[in-house]
Amino acid sequence: MNVESSLFCELTAEQLEAVLRAALDTQVVQARLLSGGLFNTTYFIQTATRGDVVLRVGPINRHLLLPYEHRLMEIEAQVYRICASHGIEASELLALDTGKTVIDRDYMIVRYLPGQNLYEFRQEEHLPRIMQELGDAVARMNAVTAPRFGRIDTVTSGGGFARWSEFLLSEVDEWIPLAQRAALLTCTECERLRSTFSEHAPLFDEITTPCLTHTDLGPGNLLVRTDGERPEFGAIIDPDRAFFGDPMFEFCQITWMLTDDFLRGYGGALPSDEASVRRRKLYRALRLCWDAYVWEMEYNKHEYMLSSMNIVRQIMNECERVSLQ
């Protein structure tokens, strides 16, 4: 059991049976808790009539969540539907319940894909090809566009923002009161953060096409299929924090995948002009703000919060120095 996260909580055998019966009209043959999750509680389940599936159960203590985190399963399900319609390798959604009709938590069920995530995969001789396949898959995901910027569920229901800067500033404004209550930054530092993003609005608004952006492409969220003649890239999973925005947000914090093979599949190197580099630096600051709140309030990892906020302060200082030149 995960004892660090305040959001994780296992289901009873009776609850597992109730969920599978309501969602798929089947029974549990065997259930096994999957490790690694801090936000959701995840199970591999062999069913009596529907094959092998993965059940993801939303968090307890929902009062701790960031506002958009209350809608993560809806967002994830919508991204899977988008990926399916565009031929992008992703999980196959089988069931979703955000009405809390069976248990007092959201849950979704996806078809199990045999294989390993990239963190676990150890067949080094296949990695160059798989990384190129991954680059191609991410490029195809980032090529999906929308009429407005914002969280997936907001945009697909007719909302969102006309300008990229408006979405980013709305996220900063939403985060600041939570950060102050959690003592992540001082009031003065929060004002500096808001001013930094506001002053860079023209730079952000050079981005005019809202693109589907996963935002959490860690190796644990990328699956390699191992059930064929040779391993191959299998699926992008856990896109619950996705939005329509600048696809370069993918690479502001998570840069491990930027190998020559990945970039070959992605279509080339990332832009390295001053404006692009500055944007990615500010995206990293926002990403770390989200992370810091999660580390402190949800996962009880105070030292990770401190590290994240120190980097945010460094980025603000760097941006202010450049502005003064």
Model segments located where?
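ATP/Mg2+ or Mg2+-diphosphate-binding catalytic cores
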Residues: 3-8, 291-325
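An alpha-helical support segment within catalytic cores of ATP-dependent transferases
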Residues: 9-27, 101, 124, 128-132, ...
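ATP-binding pocket architecture of kinase catalytic cores
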Residues: 32-174, 178-180, 184
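Membrane-proximal envelope and lipid/glycan-remodeling enzymes
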Residues: 53-55, 65, 284, 291, ...
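Short beta-strand segments
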Residues: 56-57, 94-95, 150-153, 212-215, ...
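A short secondary-structure junction motif
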Residues: 179-182, 218, 253, 290-302
